[in-house]
Amino acid sequence: MNREIDIRNREHAINICKLAGKSSYEVWLSAGTTLVNAASMLSMLTMVGKTASVVARDDNDAQSFLRLVREMV
């Protein structure tokens, strides 16, 4: 599963990191050739100003994933 989001600024990246950390499954962000764990603060700060795909395994609950992405936006 994946959805695109824009990571606007440092505070937005921190919020995404917190939400990903609370998730019951692993959440990743992909931008170009970069793939980072969304729960990693250091990794998230490298994504500021980029459009990224929020990625999770397909065997996770789709509705839960969509709710998570809506909170991240």
Q: PLM ranges: what are they?
A:
Residues L45-V73:
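C-terminal structural segments of small proteins and small subunits
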Residues W28-A31, E71-V73:
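Conserved short beta-strand edge segments in small beta-sheet-based binding/regulatory domains
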Residues K18, L35-A39, S43, S64:
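Non-catalytic helical tethers at domain boundaries
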Residues R10-E11, T34-L35, N60:
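Short beta->alpha connector loops
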Residues E4-S30, L42, T46-V48, A56:
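Compact, glycine-rich, soluble single-domain proteins
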